Amino acid sequence: MLTFFRLVQYCDVQHRNIPRLRRQVPEPLLEIHPATAAAGRIQNGEWVILETATGRIRLKARYKDALHPGVVATAHGWWQGCQELGLPGYDPFGPEGANANLLVSNDVIDPISGSVPHRSQRCRVRKEGVSA
């Protein structure tokens, strides 16, 4: 199950181009329980592919013991590069990017708020380079 979180270093999708902030969280992350990662032979710090029925993105795995083993979590907003640190931007619309919005369908929308389900997406995680 996929859920989303916000990074306190950034304001929604902004400021990833600021070196002082980018040094703290330099790459898009997938937080994953170590046992879940071990089942997929995913090492801490490796690039992974996160897929839902709607799309896929590329993220760096970061172990987090506090997560339930059946849950992974990521933050949205990765597209800006940070030229001063030599860190790339990410294609906001392609499968090699890190745009978490690509993982969420607009088919189910809350009738009152218009919000999409950012807290409950079925997903699959695999090590980059391993066939689906």
Feature annotation, model-predicted:
Residues 1-18:
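Long, low-complexity segments enriched in small/aliphatic residues
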Residues 15-132:
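Long, contiguous, secondary-structure-rich segments that constitute the structural scaffold
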